[in-house]
Swiss-Prot record:
Gene3D superfamilies: Ribosomal protein S10 domain
Any one Gene Ontology molecular-function term assigned to this protein's record: RNA binding
Annotated source species: Desulfurococcus mucosus
SMART domains: Ribosomal_S10
Protein name in UniProt: Small ribosomal subunit protein uS10
Self-association and partners: Part of the 30S ribosomal subunit.
Family: Belongs to the universal ribosomal protein uS10 family.
Family annotation (PROSITE patterns): RIBOSOMAL_S10 (PS00361)
GO CC list: ribonucleoprotein complex; ribosome
Stored InterPro entries: Ribosomal_uS10 (IPR001848), Ribosomal_uS10_CS (IPR018268), Ribosomal_uS10_dom (IPR027486), Ribosomal_uS10_dom_sf (IPR036838)
Pfam annotation, one family: Ribosomal_S10
Superkingdom of the organism of origin: Archaea
Length: 65
């Protein structure tokens, strides 16, 4: 049994690649379970808007999935 984990920040590219793999597996006649989507990890970053730190402390929020 072989397990393959594939990740990408671009969902469309990931779906196309997984589709190609499933087509190859179906042509060869091998039994396949999946694809099973893994939970989405989120990276959240807060940065100050002003670089010098004086005045009001206002933050920008960035998120990467």
């Amino acid at each position: 049994m072989v397990k393959i984990k594939i990740w990408s920040t671009n969902v469309k590219v990931l779906d196309d690649f997984v589709g190609k793999i499933t087509d190859i597996v179906k042509k060869t006649g091998v039994r396949m379970d999946g694809p099973i989507p893994l939970p989405t990890k989120r990276m959240k970053i807060r940065t100050m808007k002003l670089p010098h730190g004086e005045g009001k402390k206002k933050y920008e929020k960035w998120e990467m999935r």
